[in-house]
Amino acid sequence: MDASANRAGEALRVVEDAVRFVLEDRHLTELVKQLRHDLAALLAENDLLPRVFLRDASGDVGATVEAAAALPRRTPTDLIAANAARGEQALRSLQESVLLLAPRFASRFEDLRYRLYAIERSAIGAARAADCLRGINLCVLVDGRSDPSAFARLVESLLETGVRMIQIRDKNLNAATLVARTRQALAIARRRDAEHANESSSARGAIVLVNDRVDVAAALGADGAHTGSDDLPTVLVRRVIGPERLLGRTAHDVAEARAAVIDGADYLGVGPCFPSTTKSFDACALPEFLSTVAREISLPTFAIGGITLQRLDSLARIGLTRVAVASAVTGAADPAAAAEALLGSLAGLSGRSTNAVGGLE
């Protein structure tokens, strides 16, 4: 038990350091830290034998056993995965061993193990999402337009301008038309990928997401889906779209944002930040909520609701330099020019967010 306890504590410390210093995720850091403290408290409560005094490191037969070479650690994801697995195995060993001495404690070790499973998924997901969405600070929500030709012109013009993330969102489309528009957008994006395969990432096709209709996203092979806080739970959405596609989640308060992280979302949409011309809200999000999310959570986070070019500065001041927009682009006389202006401003803001709490203008 002493060896397993040491192994678990060491593994948790490595995971904590990785999410703290590499991912810079305050929320996950707090979760791992609390888990580590809960393990220490449980071990202290369950110290039926003075395990420190019974320790015999020099006489441990396992100390001289040579195992196969450890899996290489090439990325932060490798580091987190290896040490989370080490911690989970150690907690399982503790759970089984304590059944011989004090069975009443077994379920508590099991609870710690399942908490680590959830943290591992969230941390690895955060690292993957950060890589997938690196350099993407604008998501444009596109409607179905009046006909297929108008839709194709819109999508092509946005991609040509440099937009790399679009979300198909049109509550007025029937299922058949939504499927047709999604196929169009995917074909345009994939063709552009092929044409610009040897060029910089900024010249390549966009990530194509589907709003709400996770079934359409999965069936057509879209890059992901975005769901609201009142839609299917995140864990069920993940079952539908699979592990490889991006899963976005809207959060209206800190609790929803934290839950989305631990449930496996890849990115967040937070707000509404301002009154919107495309969707009605009971109230706008408080600046304190937006600032807390920007400060605590490392998942790519997009400000939503009433975003305009003139409002980007106030969002950057509270730490949000990614935005999702609809009418600011699609409702403009020249959508491509509107998108280009947003991209230019966001590029200048991305390095100087302050996380200050103040009013939004």
Which residues does each PLM region occupy?
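Alpha-helix-loop-beta-strand connector modules within alpha/beta enzyme cores
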Residues: 179-196, 201-212, 229-252, 281-309, ...
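Glycine-rich phosphate-binding active-site loops on the catalytic face of alpha/beta enzymes
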Residues: 164, 169-171, 229-236, 269-281, ...
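Glycine/Thr-rich beta-alpha phosphate-binding loop at enzyme active sites
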Residues: 172, 177, 220-227, 248-295, ...
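Acidic (Asp/Glu)-rich catalytic clusters
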Residues: 155-161, 187, 191, 201, ...
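Structural preference for solvent-exposed beta-strand-turn elements
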Residues: 1-130
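Active-site mouth loops of central-metabolism enzymes
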Residues: 76, 134-152, 245-251, 303
